[in-house]
Amino acid sequence: MSGNHNLDNTTFLPLVAAAAGTVLIAGVFSAAAVALDEEDGERATCQNIGIAAEVISSNLLDGRSKRHASNGSGGHGEKKPRRYVCWDRQRAKLCIMNDYLGSQPSFGPEDFKRVFRVSWRTYNQLRNYLCHVQPFFRPGFDATKREKVSTDAKLLIALKYLAYGTTVNAFRDYFQVGESTAMKCVKLFTKEITTSPFRQEYFRSMTQGDAKRVEALHTAVHGVRGMIGSLDCSHIVWGNCPVAHHGQYQGKEGKPTIVVEAMVDYTLYAWHAVFGYCGTLNDVTIWDNSLLLQAMCDGSFEDIDFPFNIGGEVFQQLWMLVDGIYPPLSRFVKPISVPLGETEALFSLWQESKRKDVERFFGVFKKKFNFFAKPVPFFLWRTF
């Protein structure tokens, strides 16, 4: 593949999770780091788009999407005739250019980023890459010599679906696209993003060079040496959970939930993530099955360690902030549940305030991309 079509390392950092078939399967992936500069917030936002893309694409493995081709009588009797809709594709193309992508658009870069969750720069890089590898996104003409749905409309449909989690029919009046075409846009977008050469770069484990950059960032921001992130879990309410799975996914929250585990740094970049654990599990049971624990046990985590000095004493193991439920490990710094004296009380306050990095990550993860609360539309209906 030509280097001209690769995405910039500093703008698109997809991170993945897994969910397959009608039973969500947890998958663990480590993401890569790049230079920590003023674009950290944009990179973290693009990571969440990558998460949504992988959740959808993994649900499309083997089988066909479930369809309901029936009339009001539940599928019996004569089917209603199909109605032809003449979509005004040119009008949609002009609207997109006039509103967002033209030389003098009605809405500027900030409005575009707020609506579609990515910047113009990232969008243009995505557009160039997808047009290069996927013919579906290239401009052209259909069998009737009419111009196809524009490239921008296809890409913006996918981005908007990931951001809002609503049905694709909600966008047809603006983009002038039918439901089947819109669904194909989402499927091919997520497929190309999650099966592209970016996997070798963005899904690799943290290196010692990455660890040194993140440790230096936390030293400057939090004022302490050796910290590489904060680890925690969070529950996402599964609004469309099938009734048959309620018992498996309904925990203390009283509603079916899906658990997300993540270890993130100050810039909200996730170095480790798990998406898809059942809501009946807690932080401890998830940690017992975590690949992050496996990396600590088999010694591979030691590859990123380097010596650092705290109070005149040299330490060798990098560490992360966790809450009190996690086990007492040398790499975990937990709050003091019953502080004795002013020093311990101040330490507990410091630990709880700095651990808010991972809480901020979960807040962005849930609020900016509503698709995660509604993963059912891409479940498969298998026929034999």
Predicted segments, located by residue:
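Short, conserved non-catalytic motifs in the polymerase core
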Residues: 139-149, 342-345
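Structural recognition of short helix-loop-helix hairpins that underlie histone-fold modules
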Residues: 127-143, 165-167, 366-376
